[in-house]
Amino acid sequence: TYYPRTYEVTYLLGMLAGITSRSDHVGYVAANPVYGVPAAINAFVQGLRSVRPEGRVVLRWACLPDPAHPLDFSDRKDIEVFYARDDREPEGTHRDYGLCRRLPDGILQPIGLPEWRWYTFFIEIVRSVFDGTWNSANGRAINYWWGMRSGAEQINYSAGQNSGTMQLLR
């Protein structure tokens, strides 16, 4: 099996949310409460609190839409920074993704976008088959659980981030 260590990226995005938010409240939209999603939420909260100890995360579930509580947190004036989808949206759709800030005019400004680089897994697995290091022994589980150091995931930060902030996040 293979999967990226999503908690590494969400921890750093939680830190960035704490640094860039003007309030102690930030939002988080999670897909559904399965697999690594609760761990990613926890990592985001821990990242937030590492730079803003009084910080609080308001959680909303994308799988349970509620018109009274929109996923862009437009009903909460105390939340200007929130984390939403972790996929790239089609060019020109202006949908929220990654870590965003809602500007006073309602436009969403991207701050940081996680990128899951699945091809890293595929290249290394195929390479190990070709160089003879891959072992297909029966009854033996092989797991690939790689993080940022492996290149399986990264964060694309928006231009204009403070140099001190970037030094902290790297």
Per-range role (PLM):
Residues 1-2, 28, 102-107:
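Glycine/charged-rich beta-loop-alpha catalytic/anionic-binding loops adjacent to active sites
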Residues 2-24, 116-134:
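Hydrophobic alpha-helical segments within soluble ligand-binding/sensing domains
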Residues 9, 13, 37-40, 44, ...:
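Stable alpha-helical elements in mature extracytoplasmic
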Residues 10-55, 141-160:
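An alpha-beta-alpha
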Residues 32-36, 63-66, 87-91:
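Solvent-exposed loop/turn segments at secondary-structure junctions
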Residues 52-64:
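Short beta-strand elements in bilobed, periplasmic/extracellular small-molecule ligand-binding domains
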Residues 62-75:
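Structural motif
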Residues 77-170:
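A post-motif C-terminal structural segment
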